Amino acid sequence: MSEPTGVIHDIGYQRYIGPRLGRRHVFGALYLHGLRTVFGLGRTAKAKIFPWLVVGIVTLVAAGITAVRSQIGEVVMTYAQFADSMSWLVIFFVAVAAPELVSRDLRSGVLPLYFSRPLPRDDYPLAKLLALVSAIWLLLGGPQLVMFLGAAFITDKGMRGVWDELLDLLPGLLYAGLWAAVFASIGLLVASLTGKRAFAAGGIVAVFLMTTPIVGTLSILPSRTINELAFLASPSTLVGGVGTWALGDLLVPEGRGGGVPIGGFGPVYGVAAVLLVAACVALLLLRYRKVAAR
């Protein structure tokens, strides 16, 4: 029996001898890449047009509100009201950003490459979700900071006035976080169902806009209870209901009217918002566990 005659050739490859980063670094890299993707950073100029157009619009609106306030000396729009008024724009922002985060990977078939590394199955969707939440929060919170800085410069109450403005800003930022959590969880779940970005974008817009007529129909029924609970039927009005309940005068200044007429069902809206986000996140994780098992 002849001996083996095979030869191993050294063609110059060198083993990696550096530090092997763990799960936290992998998650951080996915999160940072997702955040950059949302705003088109590191991508073509075409990918930057829409996200930065939206950023420009909301910043311009905030600057305009600040300028008007400096002239008339009165609050034109509270920080929480600003988040409400920009929600329609956030819908389209999510419809473009969410498919970029997940639909492209589904269509190109690169998920097996992600999961071939020591990456827990839940980390991929959670990193993408956190990136989208952060992007929406920055989109709504950044202009609020512009409004705050303008108000701080024009106040005639010194540091006391600046402190009062800060106390108004913080609930506004928390409210922006609620918008971000609800919109991102729904948008990413819908986008994860298809690898085609156009279908994903259309589905996201449909979920937010087609639920609005349901609210309108329920709100004109002859039952006051149904009228006050009608706003649970749409994500946008659900968040508005939570804001009306939790923020009160910070969202609807006394004497100006407005807000969502939820009656005494504020806690119901709060619980519904938490359950909605939790359900969307659970379904998103389940979706990627199925994808990883293929």
Residue positions per predicted region:
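Aromatic- and glycine-rich beta-strand/loop motifs that create alpha-glucan
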Residues: 2-49, 286
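Hydrophobic alpha-helical transmembrane segments of multi-pass membrane transport/permease proteins
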Residues: 45-67, 88-94, 204-211, 275-279
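Alpha-helical transmembrane segments of multipass membrane proteins
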Residues: 57-61, 135, 139, 143, ...
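Membrane-embedded or membrane-proximal helical elements that form or frame transporter/channel pores
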Residues: 63-98, 102-104, 250-272
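Hydrophobic alpha-helical transmembrane segments of multi-pass membrane proteins
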Residues: 82, 86-89, 98, 133, ...
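Helix-loop-helix units of permease transmembrane domains in multi-pass membrane transporters
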Residues: 101-134
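Secretory targeting signals
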Residues: 126-127, 131-188, 192
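Terminal transmembrane helical anchor/hairpin motif
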Residues: 198-292
